[in-house]
Amino acid sequence: MDKKELFDTVINLEEQIGSLYRQLGDLKNHIGEVIEENHQLQMENQHLRERLDQSDRDKSSETENDSAQKPGHSDIGEGHDNLARLYQEGFHICNVHYGSIRKEGDCLFCLSFLNKK
């Protein structure tokens, strides 16, 4: 190999290393985003599980205390109240984005669902 071929080979390797470095940086950024999203989803999942457990406990204590009430009428009102509470806590209750966190204020789909009679 003469000096020019050796120099061209080194330049080619340098370009490949630069390209790999950029790809590695992009991959690192993507992994960071995925880890952050995973953490948010885990927190949201835990929060929803706690809410579900609390709702189940409330429902079981309510049925024990109010066994003489009509279950059909109270279940409809209670479900609506639970959805309204979830909406006030910042979660979507509409069929479009159900369960995801509301980020930009009120959702028209959720509000129309809450206002149905």
UniProtKB/Swiss-Prot annotation:
Coiled coil: none annotated. Zn(2+) binds at H92, C94, C107, C110. Residues 46-62, 72-81 have a biased composition (Basic and acidic residues). Its cofactor is Zn(2+). Keywords: Cytoplasm, DNA replication, DNA replication inhibitor, Metal-binding, Zinc. It is found in: Cytoplasm, Nucleoid. Signal peptide: none annotated. The keyword Cytoplasm applies. GO terms for cellular component: nucleoid. GO terms for biological process: DNA replication. Binds 1 zinc ion per subunit. Pfam families: YabA. InterPro entries: YabA. Residues 45-81 are annotated as: Disordered. It comes from the Bacteria. Homotetramer. Interacts with both DnaA and DnaN, acting as a bridge between these two proteins. Involved in control of chromosome replication initiation. Inhibits the cooperative binding of DnaA to the oriC region, thus negatively regulating initiation of chromosome replication. Inhibits the ability of DnaA-ATP to form a helix on DNA; does not disassemble preformed DnaA-DNA helices. Decreases the residence time of DnaA on the chromosome at its binding sites (oriC, replication forks and promoter-binding sites). Tethers DnaA to the replication machinery via the DNA polymerase beta sliding clamp subunit (dnaN). Belongs to the YabA family. This is Replication initiation control protein YabA. It comes from Bacillus pumilus (strain SAFR-032). The lineage of its organism: Bacteria, Bacillati, Bacillota, Bacilli, Bacillales. The gene is yabA.
